[in-house]
Regions:
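Long, contiguous binding/interaction regions
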Residues: 1-64, 74-95
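Short, hydrophobic beta-strand segments
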Residues: 65-69
Length: 95
């Protein structure tokens, strides 16, 4: 897939998520991020989730790590910013 197309799809997904959160979530609220990332990229995820309560779990084959981060956020914009920062990490999957 063309990187420009991928970026457009991601921007649209985050825009829709923000709309849903603004309509359904009362802020401040605790939010849980979950990402799966290759072991070689885990340090990048930890930087994005810095300051959160973090949990890491390695996959059974040891190639991937599931990283969760939990924190209280004051707005949907703060949450979307985390997703945007994470989206540039090679091989990341947001759950």
């Amino acid at each position: 897939m063309d990187p420009k197309d991928k970026a457009a799809i991601e921007a649209d997904r985050l825009f829709k998520l923000k709309l849903v959160m603004d309509e359904t979530v009362e802020f401040p609220t605790e939010y849980l991020f979950k990402f799966i990332v290759p072991v070689s990229e885990v340090h990048h995820v930890l930087l994005v989730l810095q300051g959160m309560d973090i949990d890491e779990r390695a996959s059974s084959n040891g190639k991937y790590i599931s990283v969760s981060g939990k924190k209280v956020f004051g707005s949907s914009d703060e949450i979307i910013l985390i997703y945007k920062r994470a989206s540039v990490i090679q091989g990341i999957i947001a759950l």
